[in-house]
Amino acid sequence: MHSRNEPAVGLGTIATRLAALAAASDSRWSITFLDSHGAVFERCGAAELAARVAAVAGFLDRQSAPGAPVLLVFQPCVDFLVAFLACQWSGRLAVPINPPRRHRLIQRLQSVAADSGAALALTGGGVAEQSARWQADSAVLRAIRWHDVADIDTDPAQAGLLHEVDPGATCFIQYTSGSTSLPKGVEVSHANLMADMALMEAAWGLSPSSTMVTWLPAFHDLGLIFGLLQTLFSGCPVVQMAPNSFLQRPVLWLEAISRFRGTHTAAPSFAYDLCTRRAAPEQREGLDLSSLVMAMNAAEPIVPRVMENFVDTFGAYGFRRETFAPAYGLAESTLAVTASPVAVAPKFFTLDAAALEDGRIVPESAAARRTVIAGCGAPLADVTIAIVDPATGRRRPPDRVGEIWVGGPTVARGYWRRPGESFATFGIHIAGEDDSIGYLRTGDLGAMIDGELCVTGRIKDLIILSGANHYPQDIERAAQAAHPALRVDGGAAFGVVGDDGTEQVVLVQELERTQRRGDPAPIFSAISAAVWQTLELQVSRIVLVEPGAVLRTSSGKIQRAANREAWRDGTLAVIAEWRMARDATREAVSATAASQPPGDASTLDRWLREWLSRRLDLPLSDMLVDRGVGELGLTSVDAVDLAGAVGAHVGRKLPQTFAFDHPTINAMVAHLSGSAPAPPVAPATPRLAPGSGEDLEQLLSMIEEDGRG
C-alpha cells in the first residue's frame, strides 16, 4: 500500500550509486573496520566492494528469484554491507536482523523468518556455526538454506549483472517494534531510501569530503541507513567499529573521530552519556573533536542534560555545542523526519509541566512545576508534519499536543503482508481538510514549538490518573534520580487498572549491577518520595529487576506495553517488589491504633511512625520525623484515615485536613502535644538524572532486543 506521497524516482538506487563509485577514478569512498582495540581490521574501497557485491549477487541469482526476501544474519563486519548491497544489485529484498546472543532470543529470529517468508539466509562474522545450533531447535530455521558469504565463489565469471529495478519496488524490509512473537516489517522502497538520503545529505552537509564514524548496529535503521548507506550515497568514507567495541570502551568512538578526522556521526542519547561517565581524564588526553560538523542525537527521549554534560566534558577537546543535531525519525518513514540545522546549537524549551500533562504548550513563566524538552529540528525538505487529535483526526491548534503525522516521499509503502495495519497507519487524511497528502500515523505525541518538533511521548504510554495525563518518561526520570542504585533509562512506568477500577502506576526499574544484593527498602522509599515530590502522584507498585531485564527496542527505546505484559505474566527477572498494601493494612492498622493508649510526645511519635509504616508498607526506619508524609506516599484517602485514627487514639475529633495542615511527624506531634511546631524543613532535591547511562550488559541487551527503531 502506498502513502500517496510518491517519491522522486530520478535518484537511481543504492546499487547504481555503488557502481558509479567503483567506476570513478577519484572516488574517496572506502570502509575501514576497526577491531576492539581501535586498530584497522579491514579496509575496502569502492571497486573491491562492487566486485564482492557482484559475486554474491550472482550467487543470489542462482539460488532465488528476483523479489525474494533474503535474511541477513551477521555479526558486525564488512560482509554484512556486501550482502545487503548484493540484494540491491540482484533485485532481492534484504531482511536484516541481528543474530541472537542468547537462546531465549531465538524466538525473534524465528518470528522474522516466518513473517518474511525467506527461504534463504546469508551469514557472516562467525554466525555460520551458531546457525547450526539454531536450526537444531527450530523447524522454521531448518527450512531455510543458510550460506556464509565467505564461502561464496568470487570468480568474476560467476558475478551477477546489475538488475534494473522499479524505484517504487520494495528495497528492504525493516522489522520494527511489537512483541517478539509478532514483529512488523516496514517495506522501504528504493525511492524511499534514496529520497531520505538526499534530504539528509542536504540537511547535514554530507559530501565526498565528509568522513562518517559509526559504531551503530547495522541491522537497525539508524546504523544501516545513516551510518553506512548514506556514505555510499554521498561518496564519503566511513570508519566502522562493532557496537561491543564501543560499549566496552566508549572513548574508542571518540578516538576514531579524532584519528580519522570524522565530520559526521550519530548515536542515541545514552552513548553521549556513557562517554561522559566512562572516559577518564587520562583517556581524553590527545582527543581532538574539532573536525566534527554534526553529531546526531536521535534516541528517545533526548535528554538536554546529557548534551550539556557532554559539552562540559568534551568542549575542551574541540567539541562545540552547535555540533549536536537532535533529530526525530522512525522506520515507517525510512529513517529521518526532522533535522536540526548544522552549526546551530540545539533548542531547549522550558514548559509548564502541569499544562503539558493537560496537552497544552505553555512557556514556564511562573509555573510551579517545569519540564525541559529538546527540539528535534524542523521537518526535512519535502516532508510535512501535522499535529493531529488522534481521536478525531482533526488538526490541533499550534499550542496543543497531538499525534505526529508525517507525509512526504520518505514515507514507506506499508507493513509487509499486513494490509489491515497498513491501511490503518499509512495514507491517512486529516479530517475536514481537502488535501491530497496521505499521512503516516506515527503513534508519537508532540507539538511544533518555534518551528521545531518536540516529542512528548507515545499515545499508548499515557497514564491517566484522576483525569490528568502523565507521561511515563517523567515518572521514570523522577524515580531514577532518587537513588544511585537505580539505572538511568533503565525503567518502565505504565498504568494498570486496580481492583477498585482506578488507574494505578507500576514502575519496573533496573538496579545497577553492584547494588543487586543491597537492602531494597531505602530504594523503595526514595522512589516513592521522589515521584511524589516531583509529580505529586503515587506509585502503587515498584518492581526492582536485574540489569538488562527491562524490555527495549533495538535502539534502546523502552517498550512499556511489553514490560506491562511481562510483569503481568511474571516473566521479569525480579529482585524485589513493593506494593502499596492498602486494603490489607487498613484493618490491621485500625486495630493497632485502637489498642494503643495516647501518651506524651515520644509515645505519639512512635505511634505515628508505626501507623504510617504499616499503612504505607514501608520500613519503620524510613519514617523520618521531618520528612513530608506526602513524600512517603500518603494519598488523600490515607490522610482522611490517618485523621480518624489519630483522633480515636488521642480522644478528640480532628479535621480531615490534619495531615496536610501538619505534613511531618514532628509537626503532628507538636500540634497534638501542644508544644511549639518544629520549623519547616525544605524538601530534599533529588539528584539530577544524568541521562541514558547503562553498563555493558544493559547496552548489549538493548542491541539484541529488536523492535521499532
Label the model's feature ranges.
Residues 1-7, 504-505, 511-513, 518-525, ...:
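Flexible, low-complexity inter-domain linkers and amphipathic docking helices that mediate domain-domain
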Residues 1-62, 135, 140, 601, ...:
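N-lobe entry segment of adenylate-forming
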Residues 27-29, 146-147, 154-175, 181-182, ...:
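Conserved pre-ATP/AMP-binding loop-to-beta segment of ANL
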Residues 31-85, 102-110, 162-164, 185-194:
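Conserved AMP-binding/adenylate-forming core of the ANL superfamily
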Residues 121, 258, 265, 408, ...:
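AMP-binding/adenylate-forming catalytic core of the ANL superfamily
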Residues 194-211, 218-263, 278-283:
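Conserved AMP-binding/adenylation subdomain of ANL enzymes
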Residues 374-384, 390-399, 403-465:
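Conserved ATP-binding/catalytic segment of the ANL
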